[in-house]
């Protein structure tokens, strides 16, 4: 199935080019200016002309001139010290980059200059643990060296590889290797050769708290998977002609404002910037790790709105904020690379539920639903977006941490209390209807949805629950009292309320690869 990655990349890239010019409204002119501009790609017959005649941006041209001046020095160093092992971290490997954004995707077919080929030959012949991170990038990102890098992997591992992700061994980095400043400069230059706005978010001098060696290109430009900005909501009768009772939706209610976001729509966009119940929120949906997470965008006096960077970390999307263009980890809600890393910021995770439209509508008759008229040209039919991926046990990108207690893509319901996180297997939750547990120091009760596709979590205080009826939306406690399941709380006798706790669905591999202290509930 890995052959689908290049096909998906092409499909998403082409789709990004045919979006309507009438984009959804944004919150401010500043946010609008920061949205990525959809650029036309050059035709094949223009490649030679592009390489020789078109003017490069000043930053790229200056880098190329500096590279040309440094390359003879690198070759001389290798010739004068032939017995010294080649260390790519001691040489500016950014010298390999001789093409620029104006060359487009066809830049990968440009002829390689002798100096670049000589440096690549040294890299591929080196016996150093430092080379792997460079080879991964050269074989995963479109560039003129891609075929040689992949051929190297085939020789090294003796496999009929189609992509670098068919060779997971190379991602087992040597314990002594690290993402050096020279490597960060190389990585920024490589990604900047195609996407300058993406490279701006990969500042080698900025603080970073994730391993840059594991940051990979997701196959699209910045906002190439276009976020929805304050999209239109419609009433159920308006959506009746296209929505089905069995459609899976992400249900949200804040201060009485109930909304449904069909997965079949948001899978094409992966980010929804909205305001619900007066709260500025971002629904960040990582399709690759199965996690629709609703973040409160307020941090102190700031309000953050987000876009899609086009980058991945351990098969999880890296989003970016429109204020500072810092890269954020979508799963943790924390800054990962950029100006905000040192601010000790963590976005608040708000509760969502993954259920069917029929179940959501039955219990929320006043709900609205995301309009299918998004302003973008997409096939929003049921089971279209990512259908093959959702129905496959395989991941498309590297995930280094394997935990065989569950399959990599088993669905879990993740409950968050501060820094603590516990994952509840959704199949088990559906069978039991309810689970009482403690996350961190907080006693909670987790309740399955009516169709068994998700869950809700609430503080349980000192109440012991004996049974739950997700279809009826009720629980029975040990004293025989009936409690009503609501989105903001459980409502019990004498008006007693137990508040909701933040939680969301995810694949198991997201828990093991994106958290340091994620716990699996095992009964």
Placement of each model-derived feature along the sequence:
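N-terminal low-complexity, Pro/Thr/Ser-rich intrinsically disordered segments
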Residues: 32-99, 107, 124, 198-212
């Amino acid at each position: 199935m890995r052959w689908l990655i290049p096909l998906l990349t092409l499909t998403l890239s082409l789709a990004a080019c045919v979006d309507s010019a009438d984009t959804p409204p944004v919150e401010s002119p500043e946010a609008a200016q920061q949205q990525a501009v959809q650029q036309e790609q050059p035709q094949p017959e223009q490649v030679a002309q592009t390489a020789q005649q078109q003017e490069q941006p000043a930053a790229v041209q200056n880098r190329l001139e500096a590279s040309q001046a440094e390359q003879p020095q690198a070759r001389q160093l290798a010739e004068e010290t032939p017995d010294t092992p080649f260390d790519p971290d001691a040489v500016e490997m950014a010298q390999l980059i001789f093409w620029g954004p104006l060359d487009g995707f066809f830049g990968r077919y440009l002829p390689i200059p002798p100096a670049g080929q000589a440096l690549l030959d040294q890299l591929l012949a080196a016996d150093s643990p430092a080379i792997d991170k460079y080879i991964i990038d050269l074989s995963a990102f479109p560039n003129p060296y891609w075929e040689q890098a992949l051929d190297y992997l085939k020789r090294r591992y003796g496999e009929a590889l189609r992509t670098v992700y068919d060779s997971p061994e190379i991602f087992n980095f040597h314990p002594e290797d690290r993402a050096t400043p020279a490597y960060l400069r190389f990585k920024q230059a490589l990604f900047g050769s195609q996407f300058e706005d993406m490279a701006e978010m990969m500042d080698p001098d900025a603080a970073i708290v994730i391993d840059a060696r594991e940051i990979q290109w997701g196959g699209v430009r910045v906002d190439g998977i276009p976020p929805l900005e304050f999209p239109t909501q419609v009433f159920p009768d308006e959506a009746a002609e296209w929505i089905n009772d069995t459609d899976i939706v992400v249900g949200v209610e804040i201060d009485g404002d109930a909304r449904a976001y069909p997965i079949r729509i948001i899978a094409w966009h992966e980010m929804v910037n909205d305001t619900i119940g007066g709260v500025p929120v971002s629904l960040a949906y990582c399709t690759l790790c199965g996690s629709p997470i609703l973040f409160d965008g307020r941090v102190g006096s700031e309000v953050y709105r987000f876009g899609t960077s086009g980058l991945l970390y351990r098969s999880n999307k890296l989003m970016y904020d429109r204020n500072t263009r810092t890269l954020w980890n979508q799963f943790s809600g924390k800054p990962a690379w950029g100006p905000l890393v040192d601010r000790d910021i963590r976005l608040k995770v708000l509760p969502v539920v993954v259920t069917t439209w029929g179940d959501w509508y039955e219990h929320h008759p006043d709900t609205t639903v995301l309009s299918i008229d998004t302003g973008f040209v997409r096939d929003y039919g049921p089971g279209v977006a990512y259908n093959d991926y959702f129905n496959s046990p395989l991941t498309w990108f590297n995930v280094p941490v394997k935990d065989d207690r569950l399959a990599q893509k088993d669905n879990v319901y993740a409950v968050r209390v501060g820094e603590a996180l516990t994952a509840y297997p959704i199949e088990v939750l559906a069978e039991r209807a309810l689970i009482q547990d403690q996350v961190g120091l907080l006693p909670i009760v987790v309740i399955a949805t009516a169709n068994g596709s998700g869950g809700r979590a609430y503080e349980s205080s000192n109440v012991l629950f004996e049974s739950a009826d997700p279809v009826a939306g009720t629980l029975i406690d040990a004293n025989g009292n009936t409690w009503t399941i609501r989105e903001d709380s459980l409502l019990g006798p004498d008006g007693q309320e137990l508040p909701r706790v933040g939680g969301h669905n995810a694949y198991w591999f997201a828990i093991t690869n994106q958290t340091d202290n994620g716990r699996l509930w095992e009964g």
